[in-house]
Amino acid sequence: MSSIETYMQSVGEQARTASRAMMRATGAAKNQALLAMAEAILAQRAELQAANAKDVAAARANGLEAALLDRLTLSDRSIALMAEGLRQIAALPDPVGSITATSVRPNGMRVAQMRVPLGVIGIIYESRPNVTIDAAALCLKSGNATILRGGSEALHSNVALGRIVQAGLQAAGLPTAAVQVIDTTDRAAVGKLVTMTEHVDVIVPRGGKGLISRLAQEARVPLIKHLDGNCHVYVDAAADLAKAHDIAFNAKTYRYGVCGAMETLLVHADVAQRLLPVLGQALHEHGVELRGCARALQWLPEGKPADDADWATEYLGPVLAVRVVDTIDEAMDHIARWGSGHTDAIVTENLSAAQRFQREVDSSSVYVNLPTCFADGFEYGLGAEIGISTNRLHARGPVGLEGLTTLKWVLNGEGQVRG
């Protein structure tokens, strides 16, 4: 067994032991740990920024692009936001131990389901050290142990944050091994983490398509994941065009790099001539490159011809594919063929069309008269999220505290026997 395998085996064993203690942890103890972490992050800002400066300097020397450097940097504001996020998670209801679906059987036996932690969660992520705090806090609050493996470019930052997290756990009388940060940049650690089925119950990858595709191929531990956010807005024949304009513009331009950004606009032929010239001009003036089908280009003079690659692409940038369709069926067929199952929306004043779209479009979130950029756990009232899942099993859509738990059946009786 290599040194990395030995190290990861030890981490996994400690996490499994800690997970049993976390199942018993009280809500008060978990909140105490979270609030202690929030205070320590602010009190140790200088130390955190000194560690972060090492990562930023190395990343700059290695030519990391400006956008990724910005994500990597722990500014005063980002540190304050991490502390505030910890306080917000502490204020959320504790899902562990809640009872649902209670019923009484004819023989008087009481049947219910209890929400319990998943166990040990591995989180694999890139660039952003704030994920260390977000992930640790959500896993802690939901009663799980977690193993965190951040990007190599953020190693010093993540290790420093990990020390703060473990000090908070210790102050609350909780096992420090409930949150462990992998302190090696060796990629073999990731390969080992995603195959440790005896110690890890689920993996949550947060990163680019390349990372998630690799993990999906290598993992023996189940993944909560999404590969792409190829999101659509369909403007129906019965749409309010003022609403449609604002929804489509917001869905594309709110933030280009989020997984809920609209990447393809589908417009019914009956309204294309009235909507596309005005909307296309607004998007063009905002710096968005338009790529359309032949029919759409009639009303998009600045547009370029689209091909199949455009329908399949999550641009994560100022590019939008546009297609004119003749029916809602054609729109839904397009989404079924090219979509990623993330978030899709219809703009319509026709109730039956809205209901049909929500029923038949097989995505983790389906909206009526809303932009796709609302795909976010905070906007859903979850308080915070670990990521967005397009899986069909277990969690689907934004994954908050409840998505990091599962259900077990609990039955109570008075001595009944089965005849």
From Swiss-Prot:
Keywords: Amino-acid biosynthesis, Cytoplasm, NADP, Oxidoreductase, Proline biosynthesis. This is Gamma-glutamyl phosphate reductase. It is found in: Cytoplasm. PROSITE patterns: PROA. The keyword Oxidoreductase applies. CDD domains: ALDH_F18-19_ProA-GPR. Its EC number is 1.2.1.41. It holds the Pfam family Aldedh.
